Amino acid sequence: MRFKFSLIALSLEVVMIVSFALFVEYETSQNGSQKSASQQNASQQNAAAQQNASQQGNASSPAKEDQFFQLYPLFQHVHVMIFVGFGFLMTFLKKYGFSGVGFNLFLAALGLQWGTIVQGLLHSHGLKFPFRIKNMINADFSTATVLISFGAVLGKTSPIQMIIMTILEIAVFAGNEHLVTEIFKASDTGASMTIHAFGAYFGLAVAGVLYRSGLKHGHPNEESVYHSDLFAMIGTLFLWMFWPSFNSAIAQPENNQYRAIVNTYMSLAACVITAYALSSLVERRGRLDMVHIQNATLAGGVAVGTCADMEIPLYFAMTIGSIAGIISVLGYKFLSPLLAHKLMIHDTCGVHNLHGLPGVFGGLASIVAISWGKSTVSTMAMQATALGSSIGSAIVGGLVTGLILKLPVWNQPPDEYCFDDSVSWKVPKYRELDNYFFQHVTHNHVEHEV
């Protein structure tokens, strides 16, 4: 892997640099010297008109530079979710923590560059497009789809396969997102359909093609330990806190953005209660399952995303969150084993239960909201078409990507080396003391022996 991975990664970065040189430019007035005389005259006339309007006491629209700094805090929240939230959520496996958080950083850094180029060209009307704050937010959104899909194949793919999947998935995602927003004119502010459902079913399709019969009965490394679950819970908390920003980042300012924030806030809160209740209910001795708490508590943010900015009452948002928490826990308890043993789809992180089912439920909830007249920017048919497009393009794109990744040239690890950091990372030597400090056989306090 040494030379192949390095060569591919460096070559792709060169391609990114050249692409930015060819297609991307600053949005600010620093480009003024590159504009034609007519463009400069038009800009001066617009500036004079704005100045006259302000002198007359009229409220002028904020400058684009001001919008950049207004949205930058929301972008930072989304950025934290991508790099810290998703990263630590992937550290639950006892011997795959380095890869979970480390490859999350690598794929996100690659994905946001590629996503900027692909989405920018799709939405621009020329060969060059300005680099705005919304380009940065949408680039993070495109990266989120890859990280969701990454969860379905976590521990079973090589770094090179992850790179190939990132490039292909973002291209398919950008095409579907353009279709949903520009052609179908559907409403999906929090991206329940275009990000969560798409990312989940893309990942499941890839996992189905790459299915390993040798893992049908489990793997010794496919389990957590006390501290790995604790690290994963850190990711959950970051995601949970910043999810209102994720769902409101691209909403229209003021009323729509306000609704997106408060609806997500209450949906998440309601989701936590039902997730805890169901987790205790489905376990024989009534104990909580950390897998449910790490994941199902976030399902409310996923499900409410599509209709977050619609004029839905708060109780409707809370109902969406409550149902999403129930669906997610039941999915982890009953559906994941069924997918693995009957449909031959091994979903490492259970992305179908956190992103897939709640994403589909969110799309259906938006159809109900529109039928009640809670939105005038879309129709029931538009929403249904957008949901079908997101799932369909994800499955087809995932199957094609899986077939490409199945080629033997990508250094896919054999079964015995799955879920093991030592394949790709230098890891510390094993110490018996590591296990000693995390024993839970007795309730005796551990004495410090140094």
Curated annotation (Swiss-Prot):
Coiled-coil region(s): none
Family recorded in the similarity comment: Belongs to the ammonium transporter (TC 2.A.49) family. Rh subfamily.
Gene Ontology cellular component list: ankyrin-1 complex; membrane; plasma membrane
Gene that specifies this protein: Rhag
Keyword Transmembrane helix: yes
Processing and modification events after translation: Glycosylated.
Extracellular side, ranges: 26-72, 119-134, 181-189, 251-260, 308-311, 371-384
Glycosylation sites: 31, 41, 52, 58
Region (Disordered): 34-61
Species in which this protein is naturally found: Rattus norvegicus (Rat)
Main location as per UniProt: membrane
Location relative to the cell: Membrane
Transmembrane segments: 5-25, 73-93, 98-118, 135-155, 160-180, 190-210, 230-250, 261-281, 290-307, 312-332, 350-370, 385-405
Protein's GO biological process: ammonium homeostasis; ammonium transmembrane transport; carbon dioxide transmembrane transport; carbon dioxide transport; erythrocyte development; inorganic cation transmembrane transport; intracellular monoatomic ion homeostasis; methylammonium transmembrane transport
Function: Component of the ankyrin-1 complex, a multiprotein complex involved in the stability and shape of the erythrocyte membrane. Heterotrimer with RHCE (RHAG)2(RHCE), that transports ammonium and its related derivative methylammonium, in both neutral and ionic forms, across the erythrocyte membrane. The transport of NH4(+) is electrogenic and masks the NH3 transport. Also, may act as a CO2 channel. Moreover in erythrocyte, regulates RHD membrane expression and is associated with rhesus blood group antigen expression.
Sample GO molecular function, one term: carbon dioxide transmembrane transporter activity
Topology with respect to the bilayer: Multi-pass membrane protein
The name this protein goes by in its record: Ammonium transporter Rh type A
Pfam families, A to Z: Ammonium_transp (PF00909)
Membrane topology (Cytoplasmic): 1-4, 94-97, 156-159, 211-229, 282-289, 333-349, 406-450
Keywords assigned by UniProt, alphabetized: Ammonia transport, Glycoprotein, Membrane, Transmembrane, Transmembrane helix, Transport
